[in-house]
Amino acid sequence: MNNERKIIDSVETLESALASLKDAEKKFSTYTQEQVDKIFLAAASAANKARIPLAKMAVEETGMGVVEDKVIKNNYAAEYIYNAYKNTKTCGIIEEDKAYGIKKIAEPVGVIAAVIPTTNPTSTAIFKCLLALKTRNAIIISPHPRAKKSTAAAAKVVLDAAVKAGAPEGIIEWIDTPSLEMTNLVMKEADIILATGGPGMVKAAYSSGKPAVGVGAGNTPAIIDDTADIVLAVNSIIHSKTFDNGMICASEQSVIVHQNVYDAVKTEFAARGCYFLDPEETEKVRKTILINGALNAKIVGQSAFRIAELAGVTVPEGTKILIGEVESVDLSEEFAHEKLSPVLAMYKAEDIHDAFSKAEQLIADGGYGHTSSIYLNEITEHEKLDEFSARMKTCRILVNTPSSHGGIGDLYNFKLAPSLTLGCGSWGGNSVSENVGVKHLINIKTVAERRENMLWFRAPEKVYIKKGCLPVALDELKNIMGKKRAFIVTDNFLYKNGYTKPITDKLDEMGIVHATFGDVAPDPTLQCAEKGVEQMRAFEPDTIIALGGGSAMDAAKIMWVLYEHPEADFMDMAMRFIDIRKRVYTFPKMGEKAYFIAIPTSAGTGSEVTPFAVITDETTGIKYPLADYQLMPNMAIVDTDFHMSAPRGLTAASGIDAVTHALEAYASVMATDYTDGLAKQALKVIFDYLPRAYENGQTDVEAREKMANAATMAGMAFANAFLGVCHSMAHKLGAYHHLPHGVANALMIEEVLRFNAAEAPAKMGTFPQYDHPHTLARYAEVADSLGLGGKNDKEKLENLIKAINELKERVGIKKTIKDYGIDEKYFLDTLDEMTENAFDDQCTGANPRYPLMSEIKQMYLNAYYGKKHFEEKPMPTEADIAEDDSAHNFKQAYRRAENGKNKA
């Protein structure tokens, strides 16, 4: 060392030392891993070489412990700590995953305040100094007054070796004349406190206002089961309890013995040099263990013979442990406390459960979080071990192991980190519940690079298209799959009007037994699905055929789930998610009982190729869109024969529904090149052929077939890109006001297009690939694909909206919600609730503009009254209608605002 170290014996010298220490740490924090590892090796080697003189000094100064055992402690602190962490990265990049864009960088915490106990003054100092050096931290030691010289000597050995190996001078410091005032100052000025010692000191560390890593009180119980190897158990406990005269905090304080082996255990203890106190002697030792309710410092680390002398009890000089046979596990029993000496309480247990109860009480009274121990046949008694592990509130549960050696780690086990600071978790008032190591003394910076989600395109295994394809597609049920029982789900109209006959005729031809549920109503309810699944369970089909529009197919999907998994909870299935792959609820695997075929009879819903189903809770009227790829049909049969006689109203509503499917899929934050192509082509076909299908009906086969294909393509697009807030609002509009789903979408789509097209939205959608608001440009692309013209994106949007409105008009869709006869007062009365439910709809998450509830409410109002532009005209404020919140006055306020008489 170039500079002679200055003695720290006052607050002034301490403050000066702390300033120098911080400078040293700042320099040390720039060292490379190679430099640090060189210093770490040199310091550990020096400490190991000084193990004997340091042990002698500790015993001489404190008058506690056994020199030979302290040699082992010092050796352990140097050798085992070095071995455990010699290859551990603690500088710079310690972990990197380039594929996921994650990098972890280790930084030192700064200055460590280390509180050192009198029980292990040199080994703990070595341990903490080595951890500090490995993690590029500076450390200042506050020794116990009874062990200040030996603690300082240990620190100096490590410091000198570290500086010689290249560490900054003064990187390790210690208080030469410790006092409470200086210890408190150290804890106040440090960046982290590493506290090992009595409960008072540890509590002070945690109360200092600085991060602290500490220990808790130990009161280790050791249970000996009647299946235990008695020789192993007894000698392990003796070995542990006598190690350094019992001053390891994990050492056994009580032994609880099954009554079946109690005498044998007692005999073995006695044979190995332990002394059983008689009742009179037990009482004398009781009075020696505690003085005024606290542990008698005079017995700590003393030999059994010396403690017996203090108690006025005569025992052989070589006695290893004083054992008191006691019954109470309460705090009133002195033997039930932590003793830090070769004094042991011994209890008789009626059975293993009684032993567990006694151990629980001993831990609760003085050793929460620390250590517990059990001896048993771990091969045959795993149930006992499991119960012991479950019941003991300790962070170290040792099996067939001397707890002093086992608790500190890596001696009698090889995955418990070596340490002389044993965390006790929240049970022991600690922040750490494991053996303290280098990871607790570094700050880890995580560098997370932006990554876009893996995307996908998923569709039914088989999609059959073309007029008249039904019988050919169904052939597979017999010829390829060997199916025998088919259950058809449809609505009452289709059933009564013979739509199921082509299916049943083909099934009869193939010899496949069939049954039909024909009671699906529009907006199917959970009650309807449960009624259908009851019949399904009785019939036990291996094939389910859904025939109809969205209602029939959605109801059939729900029945399919309830049939295969009756334990499934509907509310769990309806739980919202942000990412379908990370959802809280995992959908059960489908298709194990029945193969699912979907056959649409209208061109719009797309349910035949989607993982979605909408079901209504009949008790609340709320529609729940369910989403999971387990709901994807196995086969879709798009046969135009089923579409030919669709009435005009259905043709119009379902056709505009398909328009909104394609538009929302194209604008979705999850849109891909695959879904874009399907969406744009679907829109082009619909604009060309929906008017013909509407006007010509069953005489225009081409128009019907084109519409059938367009609806299915739009379905494939939104099956993968998902939908948006238009559908969220339409779901609730239909639920509250019983508008057909396609009509509800038609009424909201203009508002949503304008809403999404904002270049500076209040909030944009959350998805990695959606990096900035660009929906206006997306809508312009749609306009271009439809050949609508426009000089810029805004003009193109207006042309797109105009074309959609003209299309709606051609197929008989009215302009406003009000035009459909929805009562104004009821609409306004339900508006807030409807708004919140729309916001919470599963479809909202993929919308490119994340909507505020106030914005959803505004769109509903605009769609009700026919307001054309979302931002153009102000809505009435709360103050405008504060005097009277009736629907009438709300309406008047709205009109005043529109007329510019009452500017909001």
Sequence positions of predicted segments:
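Conserved C-terminal structural/oligomerization subdomain of aldehyde/semialdehyde dehydrogenase
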Residues: 3, 29, 313-453
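ALDH superfamily catalytic-core signature
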Residues: 8-11, 126, 202-330, 357, ...
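N-terminal Rossmann-like NAD(P)+-binding subdomain of aldehyde/semialdehyde dehydrogenases
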Residues: 2-103, 131, 271
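Rossmann-like NAD(P) dinucleotide-binding subdomain of oxidoreductase/dehydrogenase enzymes
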Residues: 93-232
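Carboxylate- and glycine-rich phosphate/diphosphate-binding segment that chelates Mg2+/Mn2+
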Residues: 263, 271, 609-721
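Glycine/threonine-rich beta-strand-loop-alpha-helix active-site module
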Residues: 89, 154, 527-641
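ATP/NTP phosphate-donor binding region
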Residues: 455-543, 817-818
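Gly/Pro-rich interdomain helix-loop hinge
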Residues: 736-827, 845, 869-870, 874-878, ...
